[in-house]
Amino acid sequence: PNYTEAYNNLGIALKEQGELELAIQAYHKAIEIQDDFAEAHNNLGQILLLLGYFRQGWEEYEWRWQCRNFSIGQRNFPQPLWNGSNLQGKSILVWAEQGIGDEIMFANLLDSLKKISNHIIVECEIRLVAFFQRSFPEIQFVPRENPPNSRLLNSNIDYQVPIGSLGQWLRPDEDSFNQNRQSYLTTCTDKSEQIKKRYQSLAADSILIGISWKSTGAKQKQTLSKSTTL
């Protein structure tokens, strides 16, 4: 009855079955027994976000950094962590986290951040630098390196924040999502046209439908859970 791992695993199983409310109860029980059980907090946060309980969900999601199996470690930048304070006249460093798909998903938050800060620097996966720079020309993008680019260690930068943590300040409720439903990524026009012509020539008069995404870094189980059948 006091085995926290069992309650956490029960929560995972219930979530897989679509029993989200019961999963929440299981995670709460695990946390009741061990209040610093990071995995249960993180799992609870993801379900709360899924159900639209955004404020509490984002708060629980912050436990991800303390999870034993969280694949991407924190970046140790010297600037203070941004806590949602006024950014007028301030600069902020945003560092991307997790996989390339997560970086693209969380980039949706950058448009909202632009509205409250005029000086934003983003550290991201090198393959996304040109893509993001084209999509957000007002923001400076720097490829992720180890150790970090020395420019990002500058004490003149006022704050730093992981990109996934922007949600608790910029997406606190359903209205904040509804107000930011516009597209935010810009493709390369020339390359898009080249690809379009190539497949049109191959398809002749047939209808073209193309959707392709493969997560090479994910485990097979995770990949299957993110995929759909044809």
Residues of each region from the PLM?
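Alpha-helical solenoid repeat scaffolds of the TPR/TPR-like class and their adjacent stem/linker regions
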Residues: P1-L230
